[in-house]
């Protein structure tokens, strides 16, 4: 049975973990589908959905380059679902600042009508885990793993906030674009990847 073709942008970050989560989501859903790592424009053009994993957002933006970012932007604006995780959320945003250095000037996709603050909870040593609820996604409980995580400081009227922590926005959805501050691939819970798979079906 055929199903959606999901790509994980493999320039940086937890690529294998996200691929594993999508494999689990496909298996649990009992549907067809495939997942692969992608890093060039021609491969992205063939996808039904794209995951942009965590890492260093300024590096990802630089490595991606103009053509790759343009193809992602065109595909997503044409309706392809995208899922940005941590640095991937930053890349999808329309504006980013850093807690320490202010404006970053990094390349952004401007696909989510949000502004974000990088490293909002502090650096690596301030990493933490906490329980979240995403009832609008059908997920009552989810373990959020926050590692040098951003927060969403502004969200436009078309953006649905799907999770908050300490009165801070940490997960949003705008149409077919999903963005989270935390790392769902570092848990044993594929619920959020299953939700994204449904978006791509």
From Swiss-Prot:
Pathway stated in the Swiss-Prot or TrEMBL entry: Cofactor biosynthesis; pyridoxal 5'-phosphate biosynthesis
Entry keyword annotation includes Methyltransferase: no
Catalytic activity: aldehydo-D-ribose 5-phosphate + D-glyceraldehyde 3-phosphate + L-glutamine = pyridoxal 5'-phosphate + L-glutamate + phosphate + 3 H2O + H(+); L-glutamine + H2O = L-glutamate + NH4(+)
Cellular compartments per GO CC: cytosol; glutaminase complex
Keyword Transferase set for record: no
Alphabetical list of Gene3D superfamilies matching this protein: 3.40.50.880
Entry annotation: catalytic residues: 86 (nucleophile), 183 (charge relay system), 185 (charge relay system)
Functional description taken from the UniProt entry: Catalyzes the hydrolysis of glutamine to glutamate and ammonia as part of the biosynthesis of pyridoxal 5'-phosphate. The resulting ammonia molecule is channeled to the active site of PdxS.
Protein name per Swiss-Prot or TrEMBL: Pyridoxal 5'-phosphate synthase subunit PdxT
Source organism: Cenarchaeum symbiosum (strain A)
